[in-house]
UniProtKB/Swiss-Prot annotation:
GO MF term set: rRNA binding; structural constituent of ribosome
InterPro entries: Ribosomal_uL22, Ribosomal_uL22_bac/chlpt-type, Ribosomal_uL22_bac/org-type, Ribosomal_uL22_CS, Ribosomal_uL22_sf
CDD domains per record: Ribosomal_L22
Gene3D superfamilies: Ribosomal protein L22/L17 (3.90.470.10)
Subunit (UniProt): Part of the 50S ribosomal subunit.
Family the UniProt entry places it in: Belongs to the universal ribosomal protein uL22 family.
Cystine residue pairs: none
Keywords: Ribonucleoprotein, Ribosomal protein, RNA-binding, rRNA-binding
Function field: This protein binds specifically to 23S rRNA; its binding is stimulated by other ribosomal proteins, e.g. L4, L17, and L20. It is important during the early stages of 50S assembly. It makes multiple contacts with different domains of the 23S rRNA in the assembled 50S subunit and ribosome.
Protein name as catalogued: Large ribosomal subunit protein uL22
Amino acid sequence: MEAKAILRTARISPQKARLVADQVRGLSAERAVNLLKFSDKKAAHLIKKVVESAIANAENNQGADVDELKVKTIMVDEGPSLKRFMARAKGRGTRILKRTSHITVVVGAAK
């Protein structure tokens, strides 16, 4: 029995979010939330909300025991980029890409 939660177009670079996602992949759900709670990275707060949502989905929709859940898969995919313009010297301009991420968390029973 698995439950899934998805956060789409989170305003964080996928490269930065994957650093945090790699830390919690495979951990028990309770341990993952505790680890994310005390991390000072922006991605940790976003991923913590998605993990808690997946845990709530498993508990409410499928009646799973929260103590037996673990983070089975966590994926951080690239979302649409916001294109911005920054003025530079001598009338030039450069393009800035504000990257977004799609964060997917699947929790399931630890066997």
